[in-house]
């Protein structure tokens, strides 16, 4: 009898052990839908979140904002700062099984620099050429010294894609992207979901514990949270500050936040097509008046529960790059009215487009009320975020509210938005003196010299005001208690390597 019991137990155990282990699937609620899934062409913040899982970069950014190895294991600058040599990780495969090597890096960088649709051109404008110095070594030769290049390569400009897929798909690469990250593309249904699955040949696969990840765009923060609370989602990004207390009080959920390195802003159409031909786009005094009509501290308290900070520059007030000679202005409606009178207007109608998420809409409703006192009649146009960015690009807007998630080097918060040929200069503002200052800041290895250049540029921009900076918010996440290993980073990314979903 004992022998029979042992045999039965052994057979039962064998049958159980033969059953497949339940796949760990992670469902993440995003505030917006990503735009095109091509690192060369895209510009959305949520797109970068998806790329963090799908497309490894030459280098990454640590939570303390240091540049760290990823596809490149080491790098060195020439003494004159005119060449950057990078050694690549051995044995890395793209999702299509082809090798990630020096030739692939060269092909990707050249694609970023030459593809007509590429938004990476201004980020790589200092690069004269990139060459393979061996199977796993590349050399970037520069036109002039550029201390920002490493930071650029820690983002979309440094995401290496399969040359075979890029050549086959061309500008349609985003329909079936092939990269070298921990997860590979499965499917996308716009405005519904993006699905990725674990790449079994990933170079760091032993630290990937999730088998499948689904990103679901849910613009309404209340609905996002409700889906998390019901268990339909495992994690959400950009939790509304008003919901922070509810998450902290829920024993089944985990809360995480960190102050970001980006900004919230209004972009004025200065010279981007026919819609720039209006008083607000043509007269800086009206833009200055609009800015003075806004109480940034009140915005922080009303909309962000005190978790944000007011701002008037691309760098937050606690940043070493902030120009202290231009403090965040207090609200001054009378001065705003004076500027409007000086410009010859009592009232000015403005159409302001805003993404269709509750926090952004609430913020713009408060702004709408504030600026009305000075004489601005604002009508709000709500639209899906990717559509909003497309309208900005095409110049089909008058004033547009958008965020920038920030970059580890100050250049990333200003150059591409403001320079005459900037890759995402939707305002089409162009001032050769600003270009000169920002290009010189890129070329200097002396932070004190760079600070002087940024300060001088900020004085001009604070007067011309093509972008009206509103402030700097915190990134806030919420997740199920069984999701562990998440590290909050000031860049707002959700890095899935090392993250686990416990049974």
Language model regions located:
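Alpha-helical secondary-structure segments
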Residues: 27, 101-108, 135-141, 181-182, ...
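N-terminal lobe/hinge region of extracytoplasmic solute-binding protein
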Residues: 29-79, 110, 175-179, 478, ...
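Gly/Pro-rich hinge or "lid" segments in bacterial periplasmic/extracellular proteins
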Residues: 66, 154-208, 212, 333-334, ...
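Aromatic- and charge-enriched surface segment that lines or borders ligand/interaction sites
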Residues: 73-118, 133, 139, 224-227, ...
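Surface-exposed binding/hinge segments that line
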Residues: 76, 87, 121-164
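Detector for C-terminal structural segments
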Residues: 189, 198, 256-264, 293-321, ...
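Ligand-site clamp/hinge motif
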Residues: 201-246, 368-369, 377-379
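Structural transition elements
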Residues: 275, 309-342, 359
């Amino acid at each position: 009898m004992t022998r029979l019991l042992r045999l039965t137990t052994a057979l039962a155990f064998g049958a159980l052990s033969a059953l497949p282990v339940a796949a760990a699937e992670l469902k993440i609620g995003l505030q917006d839908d990503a735009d095109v899934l091509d690192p060369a062409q895209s510009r959305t913040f949520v797109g970068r979140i998806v790329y963090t899982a799908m497309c490894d970069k030459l280098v990454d950014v640590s939570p303390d904002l240091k540049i760290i190895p990823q596809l490149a294991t080491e790098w060195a600058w020439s003494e004159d700062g005119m060449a950057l040599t990078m050694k690549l990780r051995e044995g890395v495969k793209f999702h299509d099984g082809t090798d990630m090597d020096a030739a692939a890096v060269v092909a990707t960088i050249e694609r970023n620099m030459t593809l007509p649709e590429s938004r990476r051109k201004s980020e790589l404008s200092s690069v004269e050429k990139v060459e393979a110095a061996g199977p796993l070594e590349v050399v970037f030769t520069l036109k002039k010294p550029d201390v920002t290049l490493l930071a650029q390569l820690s983002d979309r400009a440094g995401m290496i894609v399969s040359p075979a897929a890029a050549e086959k798909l061309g500008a349609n690469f985003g329909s079936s992207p092939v990269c070298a990250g921990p997860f590979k593309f499965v499917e996308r249904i716009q405005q519904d979901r993006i699905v990725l699955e674990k790449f079994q040949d990933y170079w760091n696969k032993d630290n990937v514990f999730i088998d499948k990840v689904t990103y679901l765009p849910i613009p309404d923060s209340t609905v996002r949270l409700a889906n998390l609370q019901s268990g339909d989602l495992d994690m959400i990004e950009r939790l509304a500050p008003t919901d922070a207390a509810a998450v902290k009080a829920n024993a089944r959920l985990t809360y995480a936040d960190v102050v970001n390195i980006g900004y919230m802003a209004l972009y004025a159409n200065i010279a981007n097509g026919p819609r720039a031909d209006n008083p607000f786009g043509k007269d800086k005094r009206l833009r200055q008046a609009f800015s003075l009509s806004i109480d940034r501290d009140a915005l922080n308290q009303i909309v962000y529960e005190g978790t944000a900070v007011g701002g008037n520059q691309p760098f937050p007030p606690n940043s070493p790059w902030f120009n202290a000679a231009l403090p965040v202005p207090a609200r001054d409606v009378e001065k705003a009215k004076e500027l409007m009178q000086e410009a010859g207007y009592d009232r000015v109608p403005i159409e302001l487009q805003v993404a269709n998420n509750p926090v952004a809409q609430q913020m713009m409703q408060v702004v709408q009320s504030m600026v009305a006192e000075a004489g601005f009649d604002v009508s709000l146009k709500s639209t899906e975020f990717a559509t909003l960015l497309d309208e900005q690009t095409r110049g089909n807007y008058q004033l547009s509210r958008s965020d920038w998630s920030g970059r580890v080097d100050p250049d990333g918060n200003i150059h591409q938005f403001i320079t005459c040929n900037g890759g995402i200069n939707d305002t089409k503002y162009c001032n050769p003196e600003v270009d000169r200052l920002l290009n010189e800041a890129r070329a200097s290895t002396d932070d004190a010299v760079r600070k002087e250049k940024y300060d001088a540029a900020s004085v001009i921009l604070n007067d011309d005001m093509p972008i009206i900076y509103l402030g700097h918010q915190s990134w806030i996440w919420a997740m199920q208690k069984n999701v562990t290993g998440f590290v909050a980073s000031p860049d707002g990314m959700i890095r899935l390597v090392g993250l686990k979903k416990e049974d």
